[in-house]
């Protein structure tokens, strides 16, 4: 195989190595699924550090095909005769063939496909590539299922597949049911390659709903948050119930334990971000002092979502669904699978409410006095929805997150510190959002 992966790979939006100096991409594993379809595992080498593995499904044709989008065309291969390689996920026939392999629990070479017990896959549904994914590629099959193909693959048990399977088999109603998956083995380590879940048709993302609510609030200058037509508090209560339900199922199915507060982990992040972001440095000592209050405290931990925010929840006609259980982006797999306090997820949601309210102020600009008035309304919206979320969580679990104020504040600070590092690097204009939150939590 002689495709120009070196040129094509760095242009893909799901490619995760942009912060590193690219060296080469080599097709080390090629599994022929059928005559015109190969599953390719690339080893990507960098000037420094460890290599990474990426998965590409290649559809072959004798000549270029006009109906493929430009992003799908990888290039020409002259090693096995003149032929053109495409990203196969953009070919409906190839995507459908992958679904049939999962449906039959086939094994092709070292690639193992598996259908979950007592499920039906939509083999007659028409596939289309979703435009929503960033780090993976998803193919939607009509209104019935979504096939998520992992691009950067890592060794070990994939938490998205693992936790979806646990929750689905336990009958939890707040996840999209897992229908199937496929994986391989490299150097005696399992590598998850993809998964199929039920598709949440006619759903709305929590982030979009929250933004609509804040837009309505800011547009109605003489109304309070509970008087605006787009009030989100009722949904926040139901969302709190859903998160608590998922936590309860994970705790019941996978167990709980008592461990010390992860002081070393949060201090390491704090040091790293403070070194990189001057705006955080004056407050690093105060944040550390808040963390150290919990140094001798044992906390209850179990498996959690790990990266929960309003963009990871979908509102369907039946209720809220939690999606994407992969954990915090960029963290090693063992960290993403490590049990943590449920306050980690609660803190992620509370931070997301602040972003939903305050990012509109960042984007709109305006005169200082008007912005001050809108900031007060944003704070009102955040407080109302945080309260409703915690009320819902308490109603479903019997545990009110606000009863663990110091622990919750520590996890909120840790999340905000992470956000400071992210915003300083990628969206400097948004840096005031987490910085102001840190000052609020510290009481400055």
From Swiss-Prot:
Disulfide bonds: none annotated. Monomer. It catalyses: D-maltose + ATP = alpha-maltose 1-phosphate + ADP + H(+). GO terms for biological process: carbohydrate phosphorylation; glycogen biosynthetic process; trehalose biosynthetic process. SUPFAM superfamilies: Protein kinase-like (PK-like). Gene3D superfamilies: 3.90.1200.10. This is Maltokinase. Keywords: ATP-binding, Carbohydrate metabolism, Glycogen biosynthesis, Glycogen metabolism, Kinase, Nucleotide-binding, Transferase. Belongs to the aminoglycoside phosphotransferase family. Its EC number is 2.7.1.175. Pathway: Glycan biosynthesis; glycogen biosynthesis. It comes from the Bacteria. Catalyzes the ATP-dependent phosphorylation of maltose to maltose 1-phosphate. Is involved in a branched alpha-glucan biosynthetic pathway from trehalose, together with TreS, GlgE and GlgB. GO terms for molecular function: ATP binding; kinase activity.
